A protein has these predicted regions:
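C-terminal accessory regions
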Residues: 1-81, 86-213
Length: 213
């Protein structure tokens, strides 16, 4: 969102520009990744993702969090470090079983604005565009009920849930204490990304499975 437009949106929502930014993916700039910005200060998500692990288009989702009139989506779900919902003790969902796309994919032309800007979205419904439309004519949204998805429920003692809780705390606190030292969140996530990349490149499936309790 351009700075001028961000001011308008923030005013409409009765937020300060900083409060609005904190609710967007760019709010993790300097925490989970280093953002690339244009000359006017606009967050450039596409250029940022060339050097950072983020989901520009697409998001994970918790079927419980998006339910009801007060359902919500978390900006952190657009980070690869979010895999579970600590509040509801379940794994996040990533793909819509109806349209086959990642949630919140919306557009296929690399634009980040919602396809159906004229619609008031419901948090618990999939707004991805359905396929099969003729050129120049969009089909309606997928509209699948995300709240009906069945994802793996996690035991409170699950190491996955414990790891996710740790990551969530780092994102919120912007630092982490390791071996008695205060480590900035951005450094923590750089190391985590490097370790993850090494695992993906060099580890065999058996080696990874053996790490899971």
């Amino acid at each position: 969102i351009e700075p001028v437009r961000k001011d308008v949106v923030a005013h409409t929502l009765r937020l300060t520009p900083d409060e609005l930014a904190a609710r967007l993916l760019e709010g993790f700039d300097g925490i989970a990744f280093d953002a690339v910005r244009s000359t006017d200060g606009t967050f450039d998500a596409h250029r940022t993702r060339m050097g950072a692990w983020i989901y520009v288009s697409g998001s994970h989702a918790c079927p419980d969090c998006v339910a009801g009139t007060e359902g919500y989506w978390r900006a952190a779900w657009k980070l690869p470090w979010s895999a579970a919902c600590v509040k509801h003790r379940r794994m996040l969902a990533s793909d819509c079983p109806a349209c086959g796309s990642r949630f919140a994919s919306w557009r296929r032309d690399r634009q980040v604005q919602p396809v159906y800007g004229y619609m008031v979205p419901e948090a618990g419904r999939c707004l991805n565009a359905r396929g099969g439309g003729t050129r120049g004519h969009r089909t309606g949204p997928c509209d699948h009920d995300i709240t009906t998805l069945d994802t793996l429920q996690l035991d409170p003692s699950s190491p996955v849930l414990q790891a996710q809780a740790w990551v969530d705390v780092v994102l919120e606190a912007r630092h982490v204490i390791i071996a008695g030292e205060c480590v900035p969140a951005i450094q923590f996530f750089r190391i985590l990304r490097g370790f993850s990349a090494l695992m993906l490149y060099a580890a065999t499936p058996k080696e990874i499975i053996d790490l899971v309790p």
